[in-house]
């Protein structure tokens, strides 16, 4: 008889493992390409970041850093996942529908993909491999 890891892992475990991998990879991507560069080049980001809602460049950069770093880390850990992912979605959707509304599909692609990823995470939750599950069993 052949040993098969596929038969050992249940469908529910596959879903939870898939959610973990999706969360970690999505967060790695947004941290690497958006969060850390904004934080490490704060002064430059302050000058160049758009202010789509007219709340001021300072608020916009702090909100972008908050969502792209703090909320992203919460999503990766699976802590307050839906809440944190929702904040990320507010940023990505404002990028898609306000900042890049007149740009080409190639430019709109990035906020669209992030919106889909974090929308899915908001809908599905963190899964079993998360701090949400450990602390709250949901």
Predicted stretch roles:
Residues 1-40, 58-66, 70, 77-138:
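Extended, low-polarity transmembrane helix blocks
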């Amino acid at each position: 008889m052949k040993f098969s890891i596929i038969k050992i892992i249940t469908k529910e475990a596959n879903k939870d493992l898939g959610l973990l991998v999706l969360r970690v990879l999505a967060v790695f991507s947004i941290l690497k390409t958006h969060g850390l560069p904004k934080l490490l080049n704060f002064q430059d980001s302050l000058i160049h970041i758009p202010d789509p809602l007219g709340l001021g460049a300072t608020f916009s950069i702090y909100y972008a850093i908050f969502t792209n770093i703090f909320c992203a880390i919460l999503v990766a850990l699976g802590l307050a996942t839906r809440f944190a992912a929702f904040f990320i979605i507010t940023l990505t959707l404002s990028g898609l529908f306000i900042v890049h509304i007149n740009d080409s599909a190639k430019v709109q692609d990035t906020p669209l993909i992030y919106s889909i990823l974090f929308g899915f995470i908001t809908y599905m939750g963190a899964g079993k491999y998360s701090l949400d599950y450990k602390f709250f069993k949901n």
